[in-house]
């Protein structure tokens, strides 16, 4: 099967660094992971042949860890340590930096107005979301009750969509996370951190939406 006929979420999980490639082209492989590469490329008016060629090159490299076949308990432990704990570190620091940048550079036209507010909203939403997963959903899945978790999973997926929408607002506010020429060191460091957060959050959501939740619902 050609790559163009496969879902973005599947490609992101099966080809090393495909997620970084999709991020470069601003293609949503986490919340929009069920759309095929061809459809996603058409929506962005991108040349699918070029992207397929880049994916073929990436596919020559061995994948570090194939989470598609990992035990669900191992996936959950990985999500908590690699993503949940990391987001809890990332967001408070980014909020502090955004507060400083918005205050110090308030008179500059390029200042990302409202960024502190949007990062704070994301922090509050994610904190509540991750707590619900860790206290309710993940224990259910680990106990083999994932097939009965349709309700909690649909809520989590809906909250993933909301987080994805906030990321789009943050990208819009920051000129696609591109610092202007006059950006100070804090401003540049903050944008590096936001890019890292977006990468991490998209990988995190993709792992849950495209692997953990479907397998749990299937009764594993």
Swiss-Prot record:
One GO molecular-function entry: metal ion binding
Alphabetical list of Pfam families matching this protein: Hemerythrin, ScdA_N
Gene3D superfamilies in UniProt: nmb1532 protein domain like
Primary residence: cytoplasm
UniProt keyword annotations, A-Z: Cytoplasm, Iron, Metal-binding, Stress response
GO term, biological process aspect, one: protein repair
Keyword Transcription: no
UniProt-annotated location(s): Cytoplasm
GO cellular component: cytoplasm
PANTHER family per record: IRON-SULFUR CLUSTER REPAIR PROTEIN YTFE
Subunit structure of this chain's protein: Homodimer.
Function as written in the Swiss-Prot or TrEMBL entry: Di-iron-containing protein involved in the repair of iron-sulfur clusters damaged by oxidative and nitrosative stress conditions.
Assigned protein family: Belongs to the RIC family. YtfE subfamily.
Protein name per Swiss-Prot or TrEMBL: Iron-sulfur cluster repair protein YtfE
Gene: ytfE
